[in-house]
Amino acid sequence: MQVIQLQGNDKRLYELVAPLVMNPEVLRQNHNYPFRTTENFVWFIGMEKKNVIGFIPVEHKKKEYIINNYYVKDNKEETLKLLLEKVISETNADVNLTSVTFIEHRQVFKELGFSEEKVWTRYVKMKKDR
């Protein structure tokens, strides 16, 4: 898998992810929460050949990076792990990295150094230990 990074308003981003973010099956996996982007986002997109197999949009706010939703084809943990490793390596270690993580992926985040801060029914707020 190759991971590419695109700014939140990059034309290529829309070409790559539009078929997914408007797909009812992908939206269902995201609990019908819409994906959004602005110029403050960097998208980490996992590609296999010419196909998108996952993505993590990361919003850069003043004092933190935020992962608020993401998509991984077939819920493959290995894809999620590779995308997360890229996010961690490409974000400034001096800035907090937090995630609203699906309950079913909490262990992958823990393996990569995230700690739980708050648990809800479907999600866990997690913070990267830096």
PLM ranges: what are they?
Residues 1-30:
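Short amphipathic alpha-helix that is part of the acyltransferase structural core
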Residues 23-43, 47-48:
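Active-site rim helix/loop that mediates acceptor-substrate recognition in acyltransferases
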Residues 45-59, 66:
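Conserved beta-strand in the GNAT
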Residues 69-71:
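Residue-level recognition of conserved beta-strand positions in structured domain cores
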Residues 90-102:
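Conserved GNAT acetyl-CoA-binding A-motif
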